[in-house]
């Protein structure tokens, strides 16, 4: 499982890794990006990996499908919650069930949902044609005593 964890998370931490990845995405794609991270401390290693991998896949989807001009990434970790939200102002799409997404070849969205749910989180996707996409991954975490 360690081989699935990007080394950059151990080298620089989640916040810096996200900022680096989003910055590189912005330079490559021309999409203007905003990143806001508010974490009280380091997250569990597995959760850091999930957040990073979901972000990677979400940005890949934006580059391939969204025709977006702006992207916002917000990561909040306060108390017993960690919430990731990634929004774009792209073309959006008609909401569909997981089975319809797979049938239509949208494996990335399904993979993100499965990754989040396997980590005990909740995945939410809000979109409409012409209204961009908002992706949320929400996790309950143990608070150190």
Which residues make up each language-model segment?
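Coiled-coil dimerization/phosphotransfer module
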Residues: 1-145
